């Protein structure tokens, strides 16, 4: 037991909670609401965390370690209270203490909002990485934005997604600290004036700009049982000059709050819709805002301990998580040139030893490009620096590939009226990594082939991982206790030890226990579904789950088309043997992404028809879980039998949901894509259901443009029937044209859109066959339990602890920090 056993002396803890309720709300404990109790418990826990947080900062000051600044547009942290208690090794003590006074920790945890600081896998990965860094004892700061409303809260109305603000801060958030003493000015617009300083030196002066103040809010990231507390600093924007009373008194109410609105808009939402020019501008401003503030704070911290800025690469590394923070390259150059007075050569030398880039996508549209006009107008000085980086890089290309203008067209940072952010990151970064072995290989051979040929030494792979402390210890306490009972608790900090479970896979008693735990988790999720969806689902049915961002390449459409096919089969052959299935979906679609939103409507329309058809005797149920997020995800992973990881091969960089399901003993139905490939290597062909084309086959079809979905439509009557149901009103009786765009995306070869871009029809039969195998396999409970246990046992490679250790060894070169607590 760590020192928290002493701190969480039950009586002392209850007294502190009671006192906190009294001081904060002027109430007795018995009068307090659950939200008030959550706030009080959180403040008491935060007090414990703050002792370790201060000790960690002291250790940083004393040991002066190299620090990684992990820059990410998203941090999908999930709830903090339960996670902090687990990492303080005090979860059970607190649960028992609260029970003694009639309070339920589960109910209290449910009062905490999910901090709306991210959306998908990118943000959750950043959160897992921060937790692993703290647990492994490495100094790290997460750098992001404190969004007031996140992306959005998803509501389903008449089957359609409706976006409403996610007001996660409405009750205040106990696990954050406002740090106005570390605020920085961020400048937009204006122009750059030059001054000749003599000796051939020119000074660049930025004038006529608008500015906002960036104010950091620090959140503690608690390591597991080691007193280490790292910091997530998320930036809020405030006006440099606040409310203008003079304007207000003159009746000009808009002008009175103009500066406040300018600042407020910057941090209102994650990924503002960029289908229009204002949205594009806002996104670029957001990115520059948090990157500039984070760099200023990092350099100020460095200068507190060091006089020579040339030593910066020995003490700081800036990891750019995807293309959003890559303006950091030019902003760091600006600070070194204009504020530190360095020469171009020295500034470039420092920058190229400080910045590293993680590529997260094979999708070309996600490699950000900004119109030069916008970039130059919003960031005039930064743009000048990008121009010079580009000019020098183009000279390098010409030197290495004389007369090859095609190389310049493909590799230049500035080309065709655009600033290509991934190119900027690759040119300046000393490391460029993909996030699964297959993804990295595709980057080297396809998307970034020219860069790989010119600078192969920069490229490396770091297969993603997840933190077992949240996604097993917290999400699935029944299974976590069972694992510990069989192999000890070493897996909590060294997931490779979970492999010791493998011998139990053939043990009938262990199989029975495993299935019983899965059943209890399914009962828990069934209760959640009944409460939130009003649908009765059978915990004895196969829980077949696909939860992730909604995108065409992730192929939620393939899944629901197959459900439609199964329904047709049951209607045509009512006496066929069929193992009952519950198909569970959860996904947010970007507000401006029409086909993704239409897919959500289709899933809900299919659910409406199937769930209300008494004649099929509950053989199929379809559930769409509203507002999918980390907190409900934890329950879903624990309850799944089948994990759908069905992206078009070559399109998913890695995936991490696949790993969370595997850890919790679900069997994967997937393509050979992303990290599925490495999971397959770990767990073997007997414990996973693989289908569909390989990435090589997909890439070949794309190059040759020889795929014709119409041929499949014409020759496969089952597929033809399912697709016809999209447009004959079967699932949309009031508007038979409702799903026409989905139908056209799969078949309309007359449009400019290359039809069925993601090969849904090409993979359909293979997918249906794999689903049939699953149904057969599930009948043999012993075989299923064996495979499930082996999935958990072989998930050791996929801990974010392993991933982070590889980043440390190969890219960051950080020393361990030892935190001493009296």
Which residues fall in each region the model found?
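A conserved ligand/cofactor-binding region detector
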Residues: 1-822
């Amino acid at each position: 037991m760590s020192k928290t056993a002493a701190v969480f002396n039950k009586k002392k803890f209850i007294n502190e909670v009671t006192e906190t309720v009294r001081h904060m709300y002027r109430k007795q404990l018995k009068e307090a609401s659950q939200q008030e109790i959550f706030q009080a418990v959180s403040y008491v826990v935060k007090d414990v965390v703050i002792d370790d947080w201060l000790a960690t900062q002291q250790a940083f000051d004393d040991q002066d370690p190299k620090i990684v600044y992990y820059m990410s547009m998203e941090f999908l942290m999930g709830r903090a209270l339960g996670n902090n208690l687990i990492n303080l090794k005090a979860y059970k003590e607190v649960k028992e203490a609260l029970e003694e006074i009639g309070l339920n920790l589960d109910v209290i945890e449910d009062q905490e909002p999910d901090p709306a600081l991210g959306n998908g896998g990118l943000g959750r990965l950043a959160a897992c990485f921060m937790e692993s860094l703290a647990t492994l004892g490495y100094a790290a700061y997460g750098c992001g934005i404190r969004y007031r409303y996140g992306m959005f809260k998803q509501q389903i109305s008449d089957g359609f997604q409706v976006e409403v603000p996610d007001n996660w801060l409405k009750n205040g958030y106990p696990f954050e600290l406002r740090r106005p003493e570390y605020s920085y000015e961020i400048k937009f617009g204006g122009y750059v004036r030059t001054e000749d300083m003599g000796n051939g030196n020119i000074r660049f002066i930025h004038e006529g700009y608008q500015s906002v103040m960036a104010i950091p809010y620090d959140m503690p990231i608690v390591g597991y049982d080691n007193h280490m507390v790292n910091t997530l600093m998320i930036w809020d924007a405030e006006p440099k000059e606040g409310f203008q009373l003079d304007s207000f008194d003159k009746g000009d109410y808009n002008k009175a709050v103009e500066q406040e609105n300018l600042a407020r808009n910057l941090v209102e939402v994650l990924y503002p819709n960029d289908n229009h020019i204002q949205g594009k501008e806002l996104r670029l401003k957001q990115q520059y805002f948090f990157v500039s503030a984070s760099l200023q704070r990092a350099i100020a911290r460095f200068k507190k301990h060091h006089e020579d800025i040339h030593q910066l690469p020995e003490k700081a590394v800036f990891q750019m998580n995807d293309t959003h923070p890559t303006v950091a390259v030019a902003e760091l150059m600006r600070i070194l040139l204009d504020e530190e007075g360095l020469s171009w050569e020295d500034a470039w030398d420092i920058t190229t030893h400080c910045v590293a880039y993680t590529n997260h996508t094979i999708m070309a549209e996600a490699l950000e490009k900004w119109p030069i006009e916008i970039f130059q107008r919003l960031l005039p000085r930064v743009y000048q620096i990008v121009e010079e980086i580009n000019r020098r890089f183009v000279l390098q290309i010409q030197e290495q590939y004389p007369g090859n203008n095609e190389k310049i067209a493909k590799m230049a940072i500035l080309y065709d009226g655009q600033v290509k952010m991934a190119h900027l990151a690759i040119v300046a970064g000393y490391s460029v990594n993909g996030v699964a072995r297959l993804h990295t290989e595709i980057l080297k051979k396809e998307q970034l082939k020219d860069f790989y040929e010119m600078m192969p030494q920069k490229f490396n792979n770091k297969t993603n991982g997840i933190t077992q402390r949240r996604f097993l210890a917290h999400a699935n306490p029944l299974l976590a206790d069972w694992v510990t009972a069989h192999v000890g608790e070493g897996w909590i900090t060294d997931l490779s030890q979970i492999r010791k479970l493998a011998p139990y896979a053939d043990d009938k008693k262990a199989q029975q226990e495993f299935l019983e735990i899965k059943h209890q988790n399914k009962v828990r999720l069934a209760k959640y579904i009944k409460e939130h969806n009003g649908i009765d689902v059978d915990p004895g049915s196969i829980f077949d789950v696909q939860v992730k961002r909604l995108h065409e390449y992730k192929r939620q459409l393939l899944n629901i088309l197959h459900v439609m096919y199964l329904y047709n089969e049951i209607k045509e052959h009512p006496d066929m043997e069929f193992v009952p299935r519950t198909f569970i979906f959860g996904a947010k679609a970007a507000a401006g992404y029409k086909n993704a939103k239409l897919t959500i409507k289709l899933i809900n329309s299919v659910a409406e028809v199937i769930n209300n058809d008494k004649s099929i005797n509950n053989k199929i149920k379809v559930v769409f879980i509203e507002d999918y997020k980390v907190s409900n995800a934890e329950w879903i992973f624990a309850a799944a039998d089948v994990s759908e990881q069905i992206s078009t091969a070559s399109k998913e960089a890695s995936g991490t949901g696949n790993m969370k399901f595997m850890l919790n003993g679900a069997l994967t139905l997937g393509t050979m894509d992303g990290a599925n490939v490495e999971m397959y290597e770990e767990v073997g062909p007997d414990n996973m259901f693989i289908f569909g084309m390989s990435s090589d086959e997909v890439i070949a079809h794309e190059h040759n443009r020889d795929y014709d979905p119409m041929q499949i439509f014409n020759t496969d009557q089952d597929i033809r029937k399912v697709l016809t149901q999209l447009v004959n009103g079967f699932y949309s009786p009031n508007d038979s044209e409702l799903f026409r765009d989905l139908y056209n995306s799969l078949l309309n070869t007359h449009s400019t859109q290359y039809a069925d871009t993601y090969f849904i029809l090409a993979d359909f039969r293979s997918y249906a066959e794999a689903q049939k195998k699953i149904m057969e396999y599930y009948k043999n409970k012993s075989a299923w339990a064996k495979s499930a246990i082996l999935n958990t046992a072989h998930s050791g490679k996929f801990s974010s602890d392993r991933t982070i250790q590889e980043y440390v060894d190969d890219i960051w070169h950080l020393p361990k920090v030892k935190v001493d607590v009296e």
